[in-house]
């Protein structure tokens, strides 16, 4: 029975020969991942399989994970994805192990292994929505790092996984990891551009009013403001453009100015004061995302 599951993995190898042909500068605001998700759908085209005994399939997958061999780990994670779609409650208790295994594949030197790890991460963000720390933080940090990879296909898959994270994981968890040195403080400009794009997308998706609505979002709002302020003076033009777009969106709320100056360091606000004034009196426009 398990042999038939591995045929889905063998079938998926063909999709590694080329990336999505969609231009990286033509992603929509509503779904920045664009056509990248088509690759993932092909990769799990045969995922809708029924297990007669999913518990036994899970035990076998765990044994493969313990072997700590990249090929067995990859096959085990694909099986776990299948199980998570049928009986996600079986996977809950082992998600820390699963996320650590995904991270181990993300460190692999083989591009097809890394791409599979990105796609597995995306599927588990969708089905499990697990935010247990520190494994969740480690996984998101590694996916962010892969958005700066030299391999274009890996960049696309990592971005698609992060798009799925933004769709299914609470904003507070996403923003917390993105605000660290693995995200907004990363030395790679491509990673910072990804963070600015995701930040724009998350605020657009959740709504500006939600960000300003309750005291429960105070920490998240503060992180968003600080990242916006730093991105306005970033050395990367895409990062700056995304930050300007996001600040203009945030300025539509009546409490923005008061709360922004309350949460952001005074020296930083003075540094970007001219830009804030320009954005405030600039002609209003929709949120525009410079994509990966």
Regions found by a protein language model. Name each.
Residues 1-292:
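Extended, low-complexity, acidic/polar intrinsically disordered regions
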């Amino acid at each position: 029975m398990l042999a038939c599951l591995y045929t889905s993995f063998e079938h998926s190898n063909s999709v590694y020969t080329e990336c999505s042909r969609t231009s990286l500068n033509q992603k929509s605001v509503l779904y920045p991942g664009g056509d990248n998700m088509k690759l993932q759908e092909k990769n799990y085209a045969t995922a809708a399989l029924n297990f007669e005994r999913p518990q036994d399939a899970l035990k076998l997958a765990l044994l493969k994970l313990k072997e700590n061999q990249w090929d067995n780990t990859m096959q085990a994670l694909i099986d776990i994805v299948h199980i998570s779609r049928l009986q996600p409650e079986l996977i809950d208790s082992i998600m820390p192990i699963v996320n650590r295994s995904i991270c181990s594949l993300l460190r692999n030197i083989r591009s097809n292994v890394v791409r599979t790890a990105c796609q597995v991460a995306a599927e588990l963000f969708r089905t499990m929505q697990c935010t247990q720390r520190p494994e969740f933080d480690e996984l998101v940090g590694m996916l962010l790092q892969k958005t700066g990879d030299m391999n274009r296909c890996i960049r696309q898959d990592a971005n698609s996984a992060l798009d799925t994270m933004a769709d299914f994981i609470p904003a507070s968890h996403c923003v917390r990891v993105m605000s660290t040195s693995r995200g907004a403080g990363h030395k790679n400009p491509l990673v910072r551009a990804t963070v600015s794009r995701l930040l724009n997308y998350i605020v657009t998706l959740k709504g500006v009013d939600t960000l300003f609505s309750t005291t429960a979002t105070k920490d998240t709002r503060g992180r968003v403001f600080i990242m916006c302020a730093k991105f306005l003076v970033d050395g990367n033009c895409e990062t700056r453009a995304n930050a300007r777009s996001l600040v203009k969106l945030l300025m539509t709320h009546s409490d923005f100015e008061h709360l922004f100056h309350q949460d952001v360091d005074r020296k930083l606000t003075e540094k970007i004061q001219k830009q804030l004034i320009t954005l405030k009196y600039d002609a209003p426009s929709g949120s525009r995302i410079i994509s990966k």
